From Swiss-Prot:
<feature type="site" description="Transition state stabilizer">
    <location>
        <position position="78"/>
    </location>
</feature>
<dbReference type="GO" id="GO:0006782">
    <property type="term" value="P:protoporphyrinogen IX biosynthetic process"/>
</dbReference>
<comment type="pathway">
    <text>Porphyrin-containing compound metabolism; protoporphyrin-IX biosynthesis; coproporphyrinogen-III from 5-aminolevulinate: step 4/4.</text>
</comment>
<keyword id="KW-0210">Decarboxylase</keyword>
<protein>
    <recommendedName>
        <fullName>Uroporphyrinogen decarboxylase</fullName>
        <ecNumber>4.1.1.37</ecNumber>
    </recommendedName>
</protein>
<dbReference type="InterPro" id="IPR000257">
    <property type="entry name" value="Uroporphyrinogen_deCOase"/>
</dbReference>
<dbReference type="GO" id="GO:0004853">
    <property type="term" value="F:uroporphyrinogen decarboxylase activity"/>
</dbReference>
<feature type="binding site">
    <location>
        <position position="325"/>
    </location>
    <ligand>
        <name>substrate</name>
    </ligand>
</feature>
<keyword id="KW-0456">Lyase</keyword>
<comment type="similarity">
    <text>Belongs to the uroporphyrinogen decarboxylase family.</text>
</comment>
<dbReference type="InterPro" id="IPR038071">
    <property type="entry name" value="UROD/MetE-like_sf"/>
</dbReference>
<dbReference type="GO" id="GO:0005737">
    <property type="term" value="C:cytoplasm"/>
</dbReference>
<feature type="binding site">
    <location>
        <position position="210"/>
    </location>
    <ligand>
        <name>substrate</name>
    </ligand>
</feature>
<keyword id="KW-0627">Porphyrin biosynthesis</keyword>
<dbReference type="Pfam" id="PF01208">
    <property type="entry name" value="URO-D"/>
</dbReference>
<feature type="binding site">
    <location>
        <position position="155"/>
    </location>
    <ligand>
        <name>substrate</name>
    </ligand>
</feature>
<comment type="function">
    <text>Catalyzes the decarboxylation of four acetate groups of uroporphyrinogen-III to yield coproporphyrinogen-III.</text>
</comment>
């Protein structure tokens, strides 16, 4: 552990230190709302190229850093990026998300999956993270991220995103032993991948269990929570000082369960009032969030008022200011700039 005072702002807050204002970053802060990103996309139309060619992914990751100086700079990637390393071939269709060419639905397919070897399968991740650390130094915190077992299983089994998750739920409720095998293999691969990101330079790691909010609480306890715990426990065994964040979309019904995952920080979405989230999670749990991304369509006064309201409700400890999910593609770029400007002045405004 380095001298604390040189640690960047977000990392200090994520460790539970008292800071003068909540650190701020934004999910999907590198993305389509930025003209610089859209220009680069014309040159590199394939998402996999943009996220797997190191110099391109480095440039994209740093676009919001150069524009807004957020307290966190996150790796530009996708949660399905490690799947080919297990033998699950995929592509990422523009505007549609991941597509798995041969969905995993049988015992035989699961048995054929191989352990993840990130040095061989994902060497570009190390190059990108090392470059981000070098670029931002102590001025910002470099974040890595991974998908959670349930959510990666949902993509692998469904073959793509879904509104109903009927195929994976059919598997979960009809042949649970098969799904548990897949979830176990995914959890172990995700833990290996997260450790690799930390070893490559990630200072904080967020795990996205985007689709776990589609589960009833009792099914969350069976198919999501134990595997979140498995991932976090394995990371903590080797990297006990790296703060870990958990996100579940539509998490209002499972918020307390998220607090049992082993995460250090729970991302709260906008369907839960931040004051209620604080009360439900308890004083020891740190939180991230939770503005509705739609707020960024509004007037500057409205945006400022919502930021101040969120920060007041979160209190003066253990809060990372963020949206409740990713910034929307048609958000006015100047409103994102204003969001960051306001966030940087919170020690005066609140």
């Amino acid at each position: 552990m380095g001298v604390t005072s040189t640690a960047p702002h977000l990392l200090r807050a994520a460790r539970g230190e008292i800071v003068d204002r909540p650190p701020v970053w934004m999910m999907r802060q590198a993305g389509r709302y930025m003209k610089a990103y859209r220009d680069l996309r014309e040159k590199y139309p394939s998402f996999r190229d943009r996220s797997e060619i190191p110099e391109v992914a480095i440039e994209v990751s740093l676009q919001p850093w150069k524009a807004f100086q957020p307290d966190g700079v996150i790796l530009f990637s996708d949660i399905v990026t490690p799947l080919p390393g297990l033998g699950i071939e995929m592509d990422i269709a523009e505007g549609k998300g991941p597509i798995i060419h041969a969905p995993i639905r049988t015992q035989a397919q699961i048995e054929q999956l191989r352990p993840l070897e990130p040095e061989a399968a994902l060497p570009f991740i190390k190059t990108i993270l090392q470059a981000l650390r070098q670029e931002v130094g102590h001025q910002s915190t470099v974040l890595g991220f991974v998908g959670a077992p349930w959510t990666l299983a949902a993509y692998a089994v469904e073959g793509k995103g879904s509104k109903t998750y009927s195929i994976i739920k059919n598997l979960a409720f009809s042949e649970p032993a098969i799904l548990h095998q897949l979830l176990t293999k995914l959890a172990d691969a995700i833990a290996i991948y997260a450790r690799y990101q930390i070893d490559s330079g990630a200072q904080v790691v967020q795990m996205f269990d985007s689709w776990a909010g589609q589960l009833s609480p009792q099914d969350y306890d069976t198919f999501a929570l134990p595997y979140q715990q498995r991932v976090f426990q394995q990371i903590k065994q080797t990297h006990p000082d790296t703060p870990l964040i958990l996100l579940v979309s539509g998490s209002a019904g499972v918020l307390e369960r998220m607090g049992q995952s082993g995460a250090d920080i729970v991302t709260v979405d906008w369907t839960v009032d931040m004051a209620d989230a604080r009360a439900r999670l308890g004083k020891q749990m740190k939180v991230q969030g939770n503005l509705d991304p739609g707020v960024l369509y509004a007037s500057k006064q409205f945006i400022r008022d919502r930021i101040i309201d969120t920060v007041r409700k979160a209190g003066n400890w253990g809060h990372i200011l963020n949206l409740g999910h990713g910034v929307l593609p048609d958000t006015p770029e100047e409103n994102v700039a204003f969001f960051f400007e306001t966030a940087k002045q919170l020690n005066v405004l609140v």
